[in-house]
């Protein structure tokens, strides 16, 4: 079961629904630690126990931050969990304010007056590192350079964007401040 990522990665990343059957408590704990949701944030994932009871994986995934706080402070080591949760359930964050450390992406494919604050994340293996971030509307975007480290405080709305292929979180910058590089980037 320690090799679940490489064995199941392709199946999980392309599925709309993933069901793990006959889960013991130990298997459930292992699946939460492996963060299966990271492999496909938009998939519905259920854990069925040996008695046939079904558990919604996302609903029971513990989050290390308070989504009801006035400002949701995302610690650097928790960015990936927040990204996955916000991608899978954007309405949970609609109207909320978040603060996090990120790198700026200001490529030509980003609309004027916007940038993408994000982090590089690994879903399955080292060859699978990708930039994970949400569009952030920020009128002073021209002051940023690619890979600048910034501390972002932003309000969130849920909008339909082609990049999201459906509704997703859009950040509206309140503050964007220069920051020190994360210990683990």
Language model segments and positions:
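OB-fold and OB-like single-stranded nucleic-acid-recognition modules
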Residues: 1-8, 12-185
């Amino acid at each position: 079961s320690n090799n679940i990522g490489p064995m199941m990665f392709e199946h999980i990343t392309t599925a709309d629904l993933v069901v793990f059957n006959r889960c013991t408590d130990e298997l459930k704990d292992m699946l939460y630690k492996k963060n299966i949701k990271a492999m496909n944030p938009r998939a519905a994932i259920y854990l069925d126990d040996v008695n046939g009871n079904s558990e919604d994986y996302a609903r029971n995934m513990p989050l290390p931050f308070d989504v009801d706080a006035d400002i949701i402070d995302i610690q650097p080591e928790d960015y990936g969990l927040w990204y996955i949760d916000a991608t899978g359930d954007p309405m949970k964050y609609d109207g909320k304010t978040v603060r996090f450390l990120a790198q700026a992406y200001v490529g030509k494919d980003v609309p004027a007056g916007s940038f993408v604050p994000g982090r590089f994340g690994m879903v399955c293996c080292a060859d699978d590192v990708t930039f994970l971030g949400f569009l952030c509307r920020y009128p002073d975007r021209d002051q940023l350079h690619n890979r600048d480290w910034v501390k972002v405080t932003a309000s969130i709305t849920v909008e339909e964007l082609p990049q999201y292929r459906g509704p997703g979180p859009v950040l509206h910058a309140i503050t964007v401040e220069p920051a020190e590089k994360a210990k683990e980037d």
